[in-house]
């Protein structure tokens, strides 16, 4: 069973599933060691760990896919990832989804806001 199928099975299961947020491969390994069954990887955490800055649209989908791919390679768990606003229009979203699939991402979520996104934790949003 691949990670996408495992993720669907976990979602169908009884009760709640806690999915802590990993910001890199090491934090994902720690979460796996602690017994979590699913991990979330957020955009703010990705950009923060890569650049030391808030997520303000300065990274592209390839950088996210590379980062999420390193997390996926480090663990044998489904990873649920932040795909920001999809990084542009419908054609970019299609490319982004394919890149995330190749990286090993089990599922993703999109923000319902304008592109480039504005960091939800910062003033002015």
Language-model segments: which ranges?
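N-terminal amphipathic alpha-helix/helix-capping segment at the start of soluble metabolic enzymes
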Residues: 1-21, 25-34
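Hydrophobic faces of well-ordered beta-strands that scaffold small-molecule active sites
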Residues: 18-24, 39-41, 79-83, 108-110
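Glycine-rich anion/phosphate-binding loops
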Residues: 20-25, 58-63, 84-103
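Conserved functional loop/turn residues at catalytic and ligand-binding sites
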Residues: 35, 104, 109
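Glycine-rich, proline-tolerant flexible connector loops at the mouths of alpha/beta enzymes
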Residues: 38-63, 85-90, 109-125
């Amino acid at each position: 069973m691949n990670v996408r199928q495992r993720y669907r099975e976990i979602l169908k299961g009884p009760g709640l599933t806690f999915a802590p947020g990993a910001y890199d491969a090491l934090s994902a390994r720690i979460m796996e060691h602690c017994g979590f069954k699913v991990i979330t990887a957020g955009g703010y955490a990705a950009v923060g760990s890569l650049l030391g800055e808030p997520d303000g649209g300065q990274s592209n989908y390839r950088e996210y896919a590379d980062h999420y791919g390193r997390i996926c390679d480090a663990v044998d768990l489904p990873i649920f990832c932040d795909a920001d606003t999809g990084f542009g229009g419908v054609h970019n979203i299609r490319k982004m989804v394919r890149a995330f699939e190749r990286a090993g991402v089990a599922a993703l979520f999109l923000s319902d806001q304008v592109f480039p996104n504005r960091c939800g934790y910062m003033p002015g949003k």
